[in-house]
UniProtKB/Swiss-Prot annotation:
Pathway: Lipid metabolism; fatty acid biosynthesis. It holds the Pfam family FabA. It catalyses: a (3R)-hydroxyacyl-[ACP] = a (2E)-enoyl-[ACP] + H2O; (3R)-hydroxydecanoyl-[ACP] = (2E)-decenoyl-[ACP] + H2O; (2E)-decenoyl-[ACP] = (3Z)-decenoyl-[ACP]. One of its GO terms (biological process) is unsaturated fatty acid biosynthetic process. It is found in: Cytoplasm. Necessary for the introduction of cis unsaturation into fatty acids. Catalyzes the dehydration of (3R)-3-hydroxydecanoyl-ACP to E-(2)-decenoyl-ACP and then its isomerization to Z-(3)-decenoyl-ACP. Can catalyze the dehydratase reaction for beta-hydroxyacyl-ACPs with saturated chain lengths up to 16:0, being most active on intermediate chain length. Belongs to the thioester dehydratase family. FabA subfamily. The lineage of its organism: Bacteria, Pseudomonadati, Pseudomonadota, Alphaproteobacteria, Hyphomicrobiales. Keywords: Cytoplasm, Fatty acid biosynthesis, Fatty acid metabolism, Isomerase, Lipid biosynthesis, Lipid metabolism, Lyase. Its EC number is 4.2.1.59, 5.3.3.14. Homodimer. This is 3-hydroxydecanoyl-[acyl-carrier-protein] dehydratase. GO terms for molecular function: (3R)-hydroxyacyl-[acyl-carrier-protein] dehydratase activity; trans-2-decenoyl-acyl-carrier-protein isomerase activity. One of its GO terms (cellular component) is cytoplasm.
Length: 173
């Protein structure tokens, strides 16, 4: 049975990472430490900039987050690729949430701009993805634009995030 709530808490995200939310062989989130948000505060098939869906998630920033200790010594900053990965994770979650079958894989993006950095002094990161298109054929493909804000200021913008859901053995190499 598909779980179609409008928001998800941390324990729900962990259940998704264990393959319990969308069924065996379907979209999963990574488990910690690669799970890059603490909750999904909004998910809808009708909202967003393009009217085709939106996902909004939050990460509570704490100075002891795993990446601050190694990136970089005496100059801690969240790696930009982790913020990007969070947006791909959200597109994959959306595809599973809408009933798409298969295992999720990030397939690329059109453009990415950083205008700031996430520091351990921040309190909250908000991620947003606006779904532009979902195609359902041999694979399920989602395309979205996204942004990341730190304490209210948008500091990452991504265009044309692409995520596919692939049946067992069909994922790109």
């Amino acid at each position: 049975m598909l779980d179609r709530r409008g928001s998800y808490e941390y324990e729900d995200l962990l259940a998704c990472g264990r393959g319990e939310l969308f069924g065996p062989g379907n979209a999963q989130l990574p488990l910690p430490p690669m799970l890059m948000f603490d909750r999904i505060v909004e998910i809808s098939e009708t909202g967003g900039e393009f009217g085709k869906g939106v996902v909004r998630a939050e990460l509570d920033v704490k100075p002891d987050l795993w990446f601050f200790g190694c990136h970089f010594k005496n100059d801690p900053v969240m790696p930009g690729c982790l913020g990007l990965d969070a947006m791909w994770q959200m597109v994959g979650f959306f595809l599973g949430w809408t009933g798409g079958a298969g295992r999720g894989r990030a397939l690329g993006l059109g453009d990415l701009k950083f205008s700031g950095q996430v520091l351990p002094t921040a309190s909250k990161v908000v991620y947003n993805v606006d779904i532009k298109r979902v195609m359902r054929s041999k694979l399920v493909l989602g395309i979205a634009d996204g942004w990341l804000s730190m304490d209210g200021d948008i500091i990452y913008r991504a265009k044309d995030l692409k995520v596919g859901l692939f049946k067992q053995g069909a994922a790109p190499s």
